[in-house]
C-alpha cells in the first residue's frame, strides 16, 4: 500500500468523527449544504435545518473551531470550511426475533465525517501581491508542453567556420 505524504498546512485544522450512527447518504445531504461556507454561517445553517444528522455535524464543526482557536490561535471569524467529507463506516448487523421462530436482520450503518477548517486571514495579508504577480505572467501563456527543437550550433558550421 502506498501512502501519500501530506504537506503540513499551517492554515488548516480538522476534526474527525468516527462511527457516527447515521447513513452516509443522510449525512452527505447535510454536508453538501455547508461545504465552502464560513464557520458562523455554517453554524446558523446547521441550527435551522430540520434533519437529525445536523446535530453530530454541528458538534464536529464546533470542535474543529475549538481546535483552531486553542491549538493554533486562529480567530473563529476568519475560518472557512474548506473540506467536508463523509465516508462509510462499519455496518452493525443484528437479528430481531420474529414470530414462529424466525428472525429478521437489522443493519445499522455508521459513517466517518471529516471537517477541515482553513484560516483565510493568511490569504488576505498577501492579497496585494496578487496584482504584482499578475503582471509577471504573460497573457495567453499556458502550461501545456510545447514542441521545442534544439538546434546544434556546432555541427552547422555557421558559428565556428568564420575567422
UniProtKB/Swiss-Prot annotation:
User: Which superkingdom, per the lineage?
Assistant: Eukaryota
Q: Species name for this entry?
A: Lobularia maritima (Sweet alyssum)
What does the protein in this record do? This protein binds specifically to 23S rRNA.
UniProt KW Chloroplast keyword: yes
| Localization | Plastid, Chloroplast
Q: How does it assemble?
A: Part of the 50S ribosomal subunit.
List GO BP terms, alphabetically: translation
Gene Ontology CC terms: chloroplast; large ribosomal subunit
Protein's recorded name: Large ribosomal subunit protein uL22c
Q: Which InterPro entries match?
A: Ribosomal_uL22, Ribosomal_uL22_bac/chlpt-type, Ribosomal_uL22_bac/org-type, Ribosomal_uL22_CS, Ribosomal_uL22_sf
Membership in a protein family: Belongs to the universal ribosomal protein uL22 family.
Please give the Pfam families that the UniProt record associates with this protein.
Ribosomal_L22 (PF00237)
Which UniProt key words apply to this protein? Chloroplast, Plastid, Ribonucleoprotein, Ribosomal protein, RNA-binding, rRNA-binding
**Which PANTHER family does the record match to this protein?**
CHLOROPLAST 50S RIBOSOMAL PROTEIN L22-RELATED, LARGE RIBOSOMAL SUBUNIT PROTEIN UL22M
For molecular function, the Gene Ontology terms on record are: rRNA binding; structural constituent of ribosome
